[in-house]
Design a protein with these regions (language model features):
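Short beta-strand->loop structural element characteristic of the AMP-binding/adenylate-forming
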Residues: 18-21, 48, 70-76, 151
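Conserved AMP-binding A3 loop
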Residues: 5-29
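Conserved S/T- and glycine-rich ATP-binding loop of Class I adenylate-forming
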Residues: 4, 10-13, 46, 52, ...
Length: 227
């Protein structure tokens, strides 16, 4: 279970992208994290839009994979394509990036999308992440989709994708924060000396759990800085 399984690359927001070495334990833990957070069953159908080299796409799908649920891959992000896929494939769970949420809402407002033409009653959960999610955007979303559950996900390639921190379905009334430590994760915020910080103090978020990467591949110097 500790054998090497996959290489994913960081986005490079803080420098040159680094290769992240993940183990079979990392990947299997991601399955359990996602399934624990969103309760996928064999009846769920997940719409996967981002490319699979992105851990945020692959690991969200893993929750359905663990439950034996179906996954649908969509090669495009036009609002009409997304809604058609959800309707035609009877998708129940969809993970969206903020720009896609915005584009769908604008298309609805401009009447480029007529929701009455789609079968959407089975769509039980929309969740978002990978960047700050404006609370006003989700409030706007709920105007059109009031019966859906919602979750915000936070993660990084080094934590095998999303879910080390998440808002939680039960906390959807508290939009804005990224949330609390996810299933079998621990987290705290510290200062530059590693001292624990408290409410309304700014610092660095550190996490611990079975999803933490093995290392930056063939990069012991950078690995030592973060592990």
């Amino acid at each position: 279970i500790d054998d090497n399984a996959a290489l994913y690359f960081t986005s490079g927001t803080t420098g040159i992208p680094k290769a992240v070495l993940l183990t079979h334990k990392n990947l299997s833990h991601a399955c359990y994290v996602e399934q624990s957070h969103h309760g996928q069953t064999i009846e769920d159908i997940f719409l996967c839009i981002p490319p699979l080299y992105h851990t945020g796409a692959k690991m969200h799908w893993m929750g359905s994979f663990l439950a034996g649920g179906k996954g649908v891959l969509l090669k495009g992000i036009k609002p009409e394509w997304i809604m058609e896929a959800i309707s035609e494939e009877a998708c129940t769970i969809v993970w969206l990036l903020v720009p896609w949420i915005h584009d769908i809402l604008i298309a609805i407002e401009n009447k480029d999308i007529d929701l009455s033409k789609y079968q959407l009653s089975q769509w039980r959960l929309m969740h978002a992440g990978a960047q700050p999610v404006p609370p006003s955007l989700i409030d706007f979303w709920k105007k059109y989709f009031p019966h859906q559950s919602y979750d915000t996900n936070y993660g990084l390639t080094e934590s095998t994708g999303p879910g080390c921190i998440h808002l939680g379905l039960e906390n959807a009334h508290s939009l804005g924060p990224i949330g609390l430590p996810g299933y079998e994760w621990e987290a705290k915020i510290v200062d530059k000396n590693g001292n624990l910080l408290f409410a309304n103090e700014s610092g660095e978020l550190i996490v611990r759990g079975a999803g933490v990467m093995k290392e930056y591949y063939k990069n012991p110097e950078e690995s030592a800085k973060v592990l």
